[in-house]
Amino acid sequence: MSEGVLKGKLFCSIYKSRRKSGMYLYVDRQKGLKEVPEILMGQFGHAEHVTDMILNPTRPLARADVEQVMEKIREQGFYLQMPPPPDEDLFMADGHPDKPVRHDA
């Protein structure tokens, strides 16, 4: 892609972790995963390619601020999207194995 077409945009690749559901790595498409620190890759596990896309500041992402994603990729070579926090209503529901136990009842 020519530089004129991508002015102010960023062509990226997105990878998901097989180890941690909901964890994704965004990287510059041309550089791939080579700028991601080894220690992070060790914790991320096998990186499965999901898609390639052009990040554009005027086009929002579902779970991350697109401008922050672009800035992190340009500064450090990657952006790590963490899994969303557990749904508090689901977490507190009766029968959830991790629901805190009340001892005053």
From Swiss-Prot:
UniProt cross-references to Pfam families, sorted A to Z: YcgL
Transmembrane segments: none
Positions of disulphide bridges: none
Positions of the YcgL domain: 10-94
InterPro entries cross-referenced by the UniProt entry: YcgL-like_sf, YcgL_dom
Biased composition (Basic and acidic residues): 95-105
Record PROSITE patterns: YCGL (PS51648)
UniProt region (Disordered), positions on chain: 79-105
Highest taxon of the lineage: Bacteria
Protein name as annotated: YcgL domain-containing protein ABO_1767
Organism: Alcanivorax borkumensis (strain ATCC 700651 / DSM 11573 / NCIMB 13689 / SK2)
